[in-house]
């Protein structure tokens, strides 16, 4: 028999701090629940247990508190954000069929110890999952500790059995109690012996074995005089620490074999709760796909749906959605995706032909869920999908941009949508009408109708057309560039080997590189990780003046260009010679667009080699690329929203904003501003929007933290409206729970009310940045819609084909290039009217590099 015992509080705590705060649409925290269940799922796969117990601490004092008033006296209270999740987590565990165990006056550690001892007595295998190293004392021939640790912000488990304990500590597991009794434990406020740390305690235990033996051999020459004095003075504390640190194995709990068998629980309730918590992916991970969620009695339908064939001549209003595909083992399709239409209480399963026909039927209007694949189908068939008048997925994104996914089942639960009818084959169909109505009402209530109707909804059609059109690339040019990069890599590698003095060296190995640079060569080093010295870009940039480091940075840059961009782009070129990137409209919390397959947002431009890549994105014969880029749009928006006269004056006069800023700060004439001063002003102009403090600014501009702080204070004194605006934005967001763009786009910020300083500071940075960056995103989206419509309305052959950050690219016949440039400038600059007018830089070329 194999028993898995999970230290509930410890793993929940670990999950809470490893995952950034997540909230549902209605503001419930979920990161600890999500992380805990993910860790648990991994443990279940790893251990394949026959029984599972989850141990939790109770709020009552334990026998250790009665023994020592100061026990755990230095611990902070559980954060409210975590405390709110604990009862929900326990409810979910019960619904999933996992038994929880607690004992008044006892800690979860003692429950782990008691269950481990019971397994040992039966010679059964026991796995203890915890983040508390105290449990390592329980390791035995039958007991393995799965120690939860954090690495790079992620939780993982380290398997600690007898061999691992011997290798890591060189002592027996039980002797870890002796070590703790000597060194104490600040986290539990266990005193130990004054002046004895882990290294000394380990030495004493390795030599004498036990605490008793240490005191029996105080005259040993191994024990130094000062240590002897401290041992004598702290004898009582040492033995108290021994008692406090010993995990008991006699807690009053059920230890019978079979007591922790996983039961059926209440799977429908578990599915419903997971949907409410918007952690839909866990439904699949726990094998709950296909289980109909428990329904609120108030939402139970009274009628059954009629399933019928679509009329030969459909008319009126339909709701259209897809039953998602169900995947089995190894991603085998158990049930394919199936689109359907709903009208009143009738469900119409749709063939591909019927679906496409419906999308452009002038006699019907469609409220759909996820218009992107529908527009793609319509455009592939030669139409525009003009029957679509509303998209529930876009509405869901607008109402909660922080969600990790948007699924009908989750949304129906979250909105407590009432089902108009029951339909076993299409279980979500009955909820569509009520769900869509509630989402429409909330958009209106939030004042987001114009944002939805004028920007988000029409943009979906624009993006679908851009994806379908794609951008032409020069395949042979990219292949030749790849050859050039590989030759460059060979040359740089040869130089690296010469400079390193060895060919037995892998520049891709951070460990080998760290050893060479910081141990062998003795260069100034940064932080050290468990795998060796850090060799990240920030560390190496400080050493760029050294030829070897310069070449390593060059090697990394060329390697990334070749693997990520050259090889990556060649894989996704279509049969038409064009790349059809997919634009993601519902991912970024600020409202920004992203793209994938491939990601064209990150095509490098800051290096000479990187910028060359743009030369291989070309116009088709007889055409040119017309590129329009907003000039400093975020700073212009900042000047508008803050009403800062100095910043507005600089923009209105056409001055260089960064030179003007430097002149104001240093009280000098603009013509006296040096490149270094301008660079510093540029860094703070942008840094202020991202909430950067003196430390970050000091790294950006290469000065001390003290100098950066003085620079920052001078800036804020020079532009007082900016600081006042930022502070008011944070205060307002803390009160109402969200920030808004000028178009009314909301972003919830529960982080602002966190008790954790780091989380709260992160929320403040987002509060500063989101209204500016989000407004810029709204502006570029609106401009895209206007440009796309204008090109169509004027019946031009020119096509909007790409957007990257604040940049729009049109592929235009040479005869239309001037007109296309005019349209780009007029629509991009005229889509909003702010105190500081928007400005664009428009250029034309045969390829992207020429046009930019």
Mark where each language-model region is.
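Conserved RNase H-like, two-metal-ion catalytic cores of nucleic-acid enzymes
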Residues: 3-4, 8, 14-53, 69-70, ...
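C-terminal polymerase-core module
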Residues: 487, 491-494, 498, 502-549, ...
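Conserved catalytic core of nucleic-acid polymerases
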Residues: 468, 566, 580-581, 585-588, ...
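Conserved "right-hand" nucleotidyltransferase catalytic core of DNA-directed polymerases
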Residues: 234-353, 365, 369, 425, ...
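Function-dense linear segments that define catalytic or interfacial modules
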Residues: 345, 393-422, 431, 585-670
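Active-site-proximal helix-loop-helix substrate-binding element of RNase H-like nuclease domains
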Residues: 99, 152-180, 332-463, 487, ...
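Short hydrophobic beta-strand that contains or immediately precedes a catalytic carboxylate
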Residues: 5-6, 128-130, 319-321, 389-390, ...
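Extended two-metal-dependent nuclease catalytic cores across DNA- and RNA-processing enzymes
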Residues: 23, 73-253
């Amino acid at each position: 028999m194999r028993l898995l015992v999970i230290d509930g509080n410890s793993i929940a705590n670990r999950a809470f701090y490893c995952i950034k705060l997540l909230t549902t649409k209605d503001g419930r925290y979920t990161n600890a629940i999500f992380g805990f269940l993910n860790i648990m799922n991994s443990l279940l796969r790893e251990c394949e247990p026959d029984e599972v117990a989850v141990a939790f601490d109770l709020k009552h004092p334990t026998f250790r508190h009665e023994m020592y008033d100061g026990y755990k006296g230095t611990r902070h209270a559980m954060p409210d954000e975590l405390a709110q999740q604990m009862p929900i987590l326990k409810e979910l565990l019960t619904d999933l069929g996992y038994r929880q165990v607690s004992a008044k006056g006892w800690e979860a550690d003692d429950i782990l110890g008691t269950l481990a001892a019971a397994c040992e007595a039966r010679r059964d295998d026991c796995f203890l999952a915890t983040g508390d190293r105290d449990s390592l004392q329980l390791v035995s021939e039958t007991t393995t500790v799965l120690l939860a640790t954090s690495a790079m912000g992620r939780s993982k488990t380290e398997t600690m059995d007898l061999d691992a304990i011997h290798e890591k500590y060189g002592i027996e597991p039980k002797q870890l109690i002796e070590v703790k009794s000597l060194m104490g434990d600040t986290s539990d406020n266990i005193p130990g012996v004054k002046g004895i740390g882990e290294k000394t305690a380990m030495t004493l235990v390795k030599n004498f074995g036990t605490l008793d033996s240490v005191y029996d051999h105080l005259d040993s020459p191994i024990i130094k005089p000062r240590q002897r004095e401290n041992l004598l003075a702290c004898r009582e504390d040492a033995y108290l620490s021994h008692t406090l640190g010993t995990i008991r194995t006699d807690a009053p709990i059920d230890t019978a074999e079979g007591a922790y068998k996983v039961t059926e629980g209440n799977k429908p309730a578990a599915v419903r709760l997971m949907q409410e918590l918007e952690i839909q992916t866990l439904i699949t991970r726990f094998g709950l796909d296909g289980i109909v969620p428990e329904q609120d009695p108030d939402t139970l339908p009274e009628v059954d749906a009629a399933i019928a064939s679509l009329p030969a001549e459909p008319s009126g209003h339909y709701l259209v959605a897809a039953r998602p595909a169900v995947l089995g083992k190894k991603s085998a399709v158990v049930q394919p995706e199936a689109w359907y239409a709903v009208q009143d209480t009738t469900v119409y399963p749709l063939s591909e032909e019927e679906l496409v026909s419906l999308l452009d039927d002038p006699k019907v209007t469609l409220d759909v869920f996820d218009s992107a694949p529908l527009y793609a189908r319509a455009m592939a068939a030669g139409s525009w999908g003009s029957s679509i008048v509303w998209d529930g997925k876009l509405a869901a994104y607008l109402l909660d941009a922080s969600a990790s996914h948007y699924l009908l089942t989750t949304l129906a639960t979250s909105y407590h949508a009432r089902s108009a009818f029951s339909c076993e084959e299409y279980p979500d169909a009955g909820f569509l009408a009520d769900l869509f109505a509630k989402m429409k009402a909330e958009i209106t209530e939030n004042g987001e109708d114009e944002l939805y109707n004028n920007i988000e909804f029409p943009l979906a059609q624009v993006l679908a057309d851009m994806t379908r059109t794609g951008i032409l690339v020069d395949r042979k040019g990219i292949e030749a560039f790849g050859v050039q990069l590989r030759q460059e890599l060979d040359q740089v590698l040869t130089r690296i080997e010469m400079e390193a003095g060895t060919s037995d060296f892998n520049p891709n190995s951070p460990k080998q590189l760290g050893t060479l640079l910081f141990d062998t060569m003795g260069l100034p080093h940064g932080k050290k990780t468990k795998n060796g010295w850090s060799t990240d870009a920030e560390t190496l940039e400080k050493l760029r003046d050294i030829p070897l480091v310069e070449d390593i940075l060059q090697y990394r840059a060329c390697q990334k260009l070749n693997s990520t961009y050259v090889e990556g782009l060649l894989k996704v070129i279509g049969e038409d010679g064009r790349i059809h990137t997919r634009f993601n409209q519902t991912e970024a919390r600020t409202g920004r667009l992203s793209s994938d397959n491939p990601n064209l947002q990150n095509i490098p431009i800051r290096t000479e080699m990187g910028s060359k890549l743009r030369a291989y994105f070309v116009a088709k014969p007889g055409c040119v690329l017309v590129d329009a880029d907003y000039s400093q749009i975020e700073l212009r928006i900042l000047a508008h929203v803050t009403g800062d006269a100095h910043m507005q004056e600089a923009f209105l006069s056409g001055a260089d904003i960064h030179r003007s800023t430097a002149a104001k700060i240093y009280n000098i004439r603009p013509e006296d501003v040096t490149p270094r001063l301008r660079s510093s002003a540029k860094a703070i102009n942008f840094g202020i929007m991202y909430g950067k403090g003196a430390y970050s600014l000091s790294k950006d501009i290469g000065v001390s933290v003290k100098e950066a702080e003085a620079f920052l204070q001078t800036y804020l004194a020079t532009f007082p409206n900016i600081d006042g605006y930022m502070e008011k934005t944070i205060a307002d967001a803390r009160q109402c729970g969200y920030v808004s763009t000028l178009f009314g786009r909301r972003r919830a910020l529960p982080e602002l009310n966190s008790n954790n300083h780091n989380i709260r500071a992160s929320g403040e940075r987002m509060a500063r940045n989101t209204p500016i960056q989000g407004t810029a995103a709204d502006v570029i989206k609106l401009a895209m819609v206007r440009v796309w419509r204008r090109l169509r309305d004027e019946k031009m052959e020119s096509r909007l084909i790409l957007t990257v950050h604040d940049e729009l690219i049109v592929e235009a016949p040479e005869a239309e290039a001037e007109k296309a440039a005019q349209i780009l400038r007029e629509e991009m600059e005229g889509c909003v009217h702010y105190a500081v007018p928007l400005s664009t830089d428009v250029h034309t070329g045969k390829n992207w590099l020429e046009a930019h």
